[in-house]
C-alpha cells in the first residue's frame, strides 16, 4: 500500500500533526477560534506592513509626507494603510478576547503556553507603540515623548536609559529610524514565538469548555475545525473590510492629521484605544515611578494567574461566584478604557483610581478568595 506523503515527509509531517490530523476535543466552542484569527491578523499585518515599508521614509522631514504620498499617489496605498491601521485594532480585539477566554476556561493551567502568550502580548504592545510613532503626526510625537519619558522614573539608570532609547537628548531622527527598525523586526519575532506557543499547546492538547480530560473524545482538526476557522476568517475579513472602507479613521486620533510639532502640545495626549486601560492605571497613581510600575504590572499580573489559582475546578462554567467576578473584571477594564480617554480632571481621576484598585484586587485577592470559598461550599 502506498504511504501518504503528508505522514512521512519530514516537513509535511509537522504541518500534518499541527493542522490536519491533530486530535482536537469535540466540544470546543467559537471562543477557541481566536487563536487562528490572531494568526490571520499577524499575516495581514506583516503583508500590508511590507508594502507600506516599500514607500515609507523613516526621516522626520519626510515621514509625514511619505504617509500622505502612500494614501494619495501609490496604487491602492490608501487601502493598504487603512487595512494596516484598522488591522491593528482588530488584532488587539482578538487578543483581548483570546486572553479573556483563557481566564474564563482556565487555559492558564498550561503554564508554558500561557507564559509565552503573555510575552507575545508584551511584544505586540511594543510593536503597536513604535508603529504609532511612524506617521510622525502630533499624537505620534507627543505619545512617544510621554511614554519613553516614563523610563526616566527608574532610579539611577532612568535618564541614561531614555537618552539611549532616543539616540540623543530629545526625540529626533535617530528615534524615528530605530522605531521603524523595531516595528519591522518585532512582528517576525512574534511569528517565531507563535510557533513556540503552538508547540507547547500541542504538547498538552487543547483545553475545552468543560475543563475535563477529553482524551477519550477527540476528532481530527481537518475538516471539522479547519472549516470552522474558515468561517471565523470570513467574519474577521468582513469586519476589517467594513472598517477600512467605510470608517477608516474612526478608531484613530484627529491630532495625527497634524504634522509633529515639538513647540505645540496637543490639549490631551493619549495612546490608541487598545492601550487606554493601562494608560488609565498609569495616570491614577500620583507618583511617577509608582505609575510606571503599575503600568507594567497591569500586564505582568497575567503571569501570576496560574500561581493564584485556588479552585478545585479548572474553569468558571460551574463557579457562579467567580463567574460574577470575571464579568465585573471585564466591566472594570471597559471603565478603565473609557477613563483613559478622558481629560485628567474630576470625576475621572477618582473613577480611575477606584477602577485601578479593583483591577488589581480581582487578580490578587478576589479570584483566589472566591476559589477557596467555592471549594469550601463543595465540601458541605
Curated annotation (Swiss-Prot):
Residues bound to a ubiquinone: 202
Subcellular location: Mitochondrion inner membrane
Biological process, per Gene Ontology: mitochondrial electron transport, ubiquinol to cytochrome c
Keyword terms: Electron transport, Heme, Iron, Membrane, Metal-binding, Mitochondrion, Mitochondrion inner membrane, Respiratory chain, Transmembrane, Transmembrane helix, Transport, Ubiquinone
Cofactor requirements of the protein: heme b
Gene3D superfamilies registered for this protein in UniProt: Cytochrome Bc1 Complex, Chain C (1.20.810.10)
KW NAD (keyword) present: no
Transmembrane helix found in the keyword field: yes
Binding site for heme b b562: 84, 183
Membrane topology per record: Multi-pass membrane protein
Top-level taxon of origin: Eukaryota
Cofactor note as given: Binds 2 heme b groups non-covalently.
Recorded GO CC terms: mitochondrial inner membrane; respiratory chain complex III
Predominant location: mitochondrion
Residue spans crossing the bilayer: 34-54, 78-99, 114-134, 179-199, 227-247, 289-309, 321-341, 348-368
Leftover remarks: Heme 1 (or BL or b562) is low-potential and absorbs at about 562 nm, and heme 2 (or BH or b566) is high-potential and absorbs at about 566 nm.
Role, per record: Component of the ubiquinol-cytochrome c reductase complex (complex III or cytochrome b-c1 complex) that is part of the mitochondrial respiratory chain. The b-c1 complex mediates electron transfer from ubiquinol to cytochrome c. Contributes to the generation of a proton gradient across the mitochondrial membrane that is then used for ATP synthesis.
Protein name (database record): Cytochrome b
Species, as recorded: Urogymnus polylepis (Freshwater whipray)
Amino acid at each position: 500500500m502506498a504511504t501518504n506523503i503528508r505522514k512521512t515527509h519530514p516537513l509535511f509531517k509537522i504541518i500534518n500533526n499541527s493542522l490536519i490530523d491533530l486530535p482536537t476535543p469535540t466540544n470546543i466552542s467559537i471562543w477557541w477560534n481566536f487563536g487562528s484569527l490572531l494568526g490571520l491578523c499577524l499575516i495581514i499585518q506583516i503583508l500590508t506592513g511590507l508594502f507600506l515599508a516599500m514607500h515609507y521614509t523613516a526621516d522626520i522631514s519626510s515621514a509625514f509626507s511619505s504617509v500622505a504620498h502612500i494614501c494619495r499617489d501609490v496604487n491602492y496605498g490608501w487601502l493598504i494603510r487603512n487595512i494596516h491601521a484598522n488591522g491593528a485594532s482588530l488584532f488587539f480585539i482578538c487578543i483581548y478576547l483570546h486572553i479573556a477566554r483563557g481566564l474564563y476556561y482556565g487555559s492558564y493551567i498550561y503554564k508554558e503556553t500561557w507564559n509565552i502568550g503573555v510575552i507575545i502580548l508584551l511584544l505586540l504592545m511594543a510593536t503597536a507603540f513604535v508603529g504609532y510613532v511612524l506617521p510622525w503626526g502630533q499624537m505620534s510625537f507627543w505619545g512617544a515623548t510621554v511614554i519613553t519619558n516614563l523610563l526616566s522614573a527608574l532610579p539611577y539608570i532612568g535618564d541614561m536609559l531614555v537618552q539611549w532609547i532616543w539616540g540623543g537628548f530629545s526625540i529626533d531622527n535617530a528615534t524615528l529610524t530605530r522605531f521603524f527598525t523595531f516595528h519591522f523586526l518585532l512582528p517576525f519575532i512574534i511569528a517565531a514565538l507563535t510557533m513556540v506557543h503552538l508547540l507547547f499547546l500541542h504538547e498538552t492538547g487543547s483545553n475545552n469548555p468543560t475543563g475535563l480530560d477529553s482524551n477519550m473524545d477527540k476528532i481530527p482538526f481537518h475538516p471539522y475545525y479547519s472549516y470552522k476557522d474558515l468561517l471565523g476568517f470570513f467574519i474577521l475579513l468582513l469586519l476589517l473590510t467594513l472598517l477600512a472602507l467605510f470608517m477608516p479613521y474612526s478608531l484613530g486620533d484627529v491630532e495625527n492629521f497634524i504634522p509633529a510639532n515639538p513647540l505645540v502640545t496637543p490639549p490631551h495626549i493619549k495612546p490608541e484605544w487598545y492601550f487606554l486601560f493601562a494608560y488609565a492605571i498609569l495616570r491614577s497613581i500620583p507618583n511617577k515611578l509608582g505609575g510606571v510600575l503599575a503600568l507594567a504590572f497591569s500586564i505582568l499580573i497575567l503571569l501570576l494567574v496560574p500561581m493564584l489559582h485556588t479552585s478545585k475546578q479548572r474553569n468558571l462554567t460551574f463557579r457562579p461566584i467567580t463567574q460574577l467576578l470575571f464579568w465585573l473584571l471585564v466591566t472594570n477594564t471597559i471603565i478603565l478604557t473609557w477613563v483613559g480617554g478622558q481629560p485628567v480632571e474630576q470625576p475621572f481621576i477618582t473613577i480611575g483610581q477606584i477602577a485601578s484598585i479593583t483591577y488589581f484586587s480581582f487578580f490578587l485577592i478576589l479570584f483566589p478568595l472566591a476559589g477557596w470559598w467555592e471549594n469550601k461550599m463543595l465540601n458541605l
